[in-house]
């Protein structure tokens, strides 16, 4: 454009303001010139087309950005957190002694609350989260105690107050800090007694080696073989500060939060840690979330602190057994209201009395008040030993199971067995009366005495497809004895859980499975519910080490 034309153009602009349409047309021309400078081919298109293309590109970018964020791995991880499928707890480290429950904005958690009994808590939000291992949370009682409980030692960093016997500044105080009364609390190094007067300076100012004196003051004492003067207040606190543990002997009263257990004091960090140290377990009672905190702990409503692995493990660890109520694979009170009579057997597990006294659980042979008269043989008590319940297939098998050998007496030799007239029959190299056939009791180890049966007695189950009679307590045990699986169909809570200790009741399908076979790795329950699926997800996380 010539200078004269340009001046004329400017003069026209000065004289007549552009209309809205002219402004838009002018802007489109400018946009076309900008685009054409980068892409000469754009000059062939009208300005309107250029504007539409640019607008579509901008719109595509606006739509793509949130879509990329949504599909990213981190977004998927956050999305999966809407269903509580793990017990990871990520919390900003807090310095001792703050133990109040942290606010929601301090806590990002994926918890297994949907799988826990309603009256058992994991005390989420309490304790100290190790900086280098977000899935490891230690109780507040182990924070700044002079011992590194986190793998990265973060529990002993940024300490403002120590729970150990001795503390010193992490750095030497400057003169300006001494004069400044408004400065924050200094960071401390926490030391146990064994770090004092050991010839190694653990404090920057060497104060841990400067307190060694030949004579201590009235409120101090010395351990045998040590030059360190320790305060009397650390006696009987459950922590052995002396090598010979003399500071923990002859204790009539415990100090500094320690628990009296017989003649001993249990230190505060071992009280409410989920592991009973007293014979009566009293050190794990009357706990709260401040004391029973940590990634491996669980708190019962009655104040008992237990290990999280003890929840829903088939054993009653809370005082009233609430740690086993409404667990995945169990029946709610509405579906299964009968209270089972449980026996603790020699393997430490708890069994229903029906199962324990059926003769099928060897660990329970000496724990039954009364043996099942139909399915077992009762060995008489000898020398103060309780009656022993053995399964009937062990009778006359040539092996003495009873102390007095009663199970091998009155046995008919096989060569004298009358089998021609079907009065008797043989199996497992023993002779049995014909009345033992098809009676719903396994007298033969190979179970052949219960095959080929046209009828089965009451308190037994008939496999119609196989013509077999099964003992009543084998129904709904998670193992299909019938070829058509009919012995595992339409199971009730009483049949599944009232008779067996190692079974899992599927939430909605009336199907009973062996607990160890429920997940493979996904739930094997027909029409598996969220709880069934979450149980297997929890088990997978636990087996992979991602959850306690």
Swiss-Prot record:
Tagged with keyword Zinc-finger: no
Protein name as annotated: LDL receptor repeat-containing protein egg-2
Single GO MF descriptor: signaling receptor activity
Segments on the Cytoplasmic side according to the record's topology features: 1-49
Pfam families hit by this protein: Ldl_recept_a
Positions on the Extracellular side per record topology: 71-548
UniProt KW Flavoprotein keyword: no
SMART domains for this protein: LDLa (SM00192)
BP-aspect Gene Ontology terms: eggshell formation; positive regulation of protein localization to cell cortex; positive regulation of protein localization to plasma membrane; single fertilization
Covalent S-S links between cysteines: 130-150, 144-159, 162-190, 168-203, 197-212, 216-229, 223-242, 236-251, 254-265, 261-278, 272-287, 292-305, 300-318, 312-327, 371-389, 379-402, 396-411, 417-431, 427-444, 438-453, 456-469, 463-482, 476-491
Taxon lineage: Eukaryota, Metazoa, Ecdysozoa, Nematoda, Chromadorea
Consequence of gene loss (knockout): Severe sterility at the restrictive temperature of 25 degrees Celsius. Accumulation of unfertilized oocytes in the uterus, although this is controversial. Simultaneous RNAi-mediated knockdown with egg-1 results in a fragmented eggshell chitin layer which often accumulates at one end of the embryo. In unfertilized oocytes, disrupts the homogenous distribution of cortical chitin synthase chs-1, pseudophosphatase egg-3 and kinase mbk-2. In a egg-1 (tm1071) mutant background, causes polyspermy.
Ranges annotated as spanning the membrane: 50-70
Listed GO CC annotations: endosome membrane; plasma membrane
Keywords, alphabetical: Cell membrane, Developmental protein, Disulfide bond, Endosome, Fertilization, Glycoprotein, Membrane, Receptor, Repeat, Signal-anchor, Transmembrane, Transmembrane helix
List of glycosylated residues: 119, 244, 527
Source organism per UniProt: Caenorhabditis elegans
Topological relation to the membrane, as annotated: Single-pass type II membrane protein
């Amino acid at each position: 454009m010539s200078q004269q034309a340009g001046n004329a153009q400017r003069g026209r602009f000065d004289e007549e303001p552009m209309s809205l349409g002219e402004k838009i047309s002018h802007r489109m021309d400018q946009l076309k010139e900008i685009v054409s400078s980068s892409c000469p081919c754009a000059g062939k298109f009208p300005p309107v087309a250029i504007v539409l293309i640019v607008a579509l590109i901008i719109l595509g970018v606006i739509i793509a950005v949130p879509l990329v964020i949504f599909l990213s791995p981190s977004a998927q991880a956050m999305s999966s957190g809407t269903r509580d499928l793990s017990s990871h707890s990520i919390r900003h480290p807090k310095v001792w002694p703050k133990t109040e429950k942290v606010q929601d904005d301090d806590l990002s958690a994926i918890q297994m609350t949907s799988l826990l009994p309603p009256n058992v808590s994991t005390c989420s939000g309490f304790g100290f989260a190790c900086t280098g291992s977000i899935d490891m949370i230690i109780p507040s009682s182990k924070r700044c105690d002079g011992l590194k409980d986190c793998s990265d030692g973060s529990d002993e960093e940024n300490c403002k107050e120590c729970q150990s016997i001795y503390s010193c500044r992490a750095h030497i105080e400057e003169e300006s800090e001494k004069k400044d009364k408004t400065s924050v609390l200094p960071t401390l190094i926490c030391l146990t007694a064994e770090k004092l007067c050991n010839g190694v300076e653990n404090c920057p100012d060497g104060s841990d080696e400067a307190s060694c004196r030949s004579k201590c003051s009235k409120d101090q004492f010395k351990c045998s073989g040590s030059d360190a003067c320790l305060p009397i207040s650390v006696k009987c606190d459950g922590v052995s500060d002396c090598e010979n543990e003399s500071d923990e002997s002859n204790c009539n009263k415990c100090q500094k939060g320690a628990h009296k257990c017989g003649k001993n004091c249990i230190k505060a960090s071992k009280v409410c840690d989920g592991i009973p140290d007293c014979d009566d377990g009293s050190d794990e009672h009357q706990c709260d979330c401040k004391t029973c905190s940590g990634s491996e702990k669980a708190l019962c409503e009655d104040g008992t602190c237990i290990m999280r692995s003890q929840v829903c493990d088939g054993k009653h660890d809370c005082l009233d057994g609430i740690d086993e109520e409404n667990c995945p694979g169990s029946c709610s009170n509405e579906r299964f209201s009968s209270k089972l009579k449980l026996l603790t057997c020699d393997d430490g597990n708890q069994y229903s009395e029906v199962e324990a006294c059926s003769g099928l659980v060897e660990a329970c042979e000496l724990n039954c008040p009364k043996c099942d008269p139909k399915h077992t043989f009762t060995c008489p008590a000898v020398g103060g030993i309780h009656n022993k319940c053995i399964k009937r297939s062990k009778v006359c098998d040539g092996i003495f199971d009873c102390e007095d050998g009663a199970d091998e007496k009155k046995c008919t030799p096989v060569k004298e067995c009358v089998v021609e007239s079907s009065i008797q029959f043989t199996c497992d190299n023993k002779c049995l009366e014909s009345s033992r056939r098809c009676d719903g009791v396994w007298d033969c180890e190979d179970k052949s005495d219960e095959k080929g049966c046209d009828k089965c007695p009451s308190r037994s189950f008939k496999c119609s497809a196989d013509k077999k009679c099964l003992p009543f307590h084998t129904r709904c045990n998670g193992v299909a004895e019938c070829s058509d699986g009919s012995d595992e169909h339409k199971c009730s809570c009483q049949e599944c859980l009232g008779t067996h200790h190692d079974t899992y009741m599927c939430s909605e399908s009336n199907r009973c499975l062996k607990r160890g076979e429920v997940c493979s790795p996904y739930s094997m329950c027909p029409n598996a519910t969220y709880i069934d699926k979450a149980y297997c997800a929890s088990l997978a996380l636990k087996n992979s080490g991602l959850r306690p």
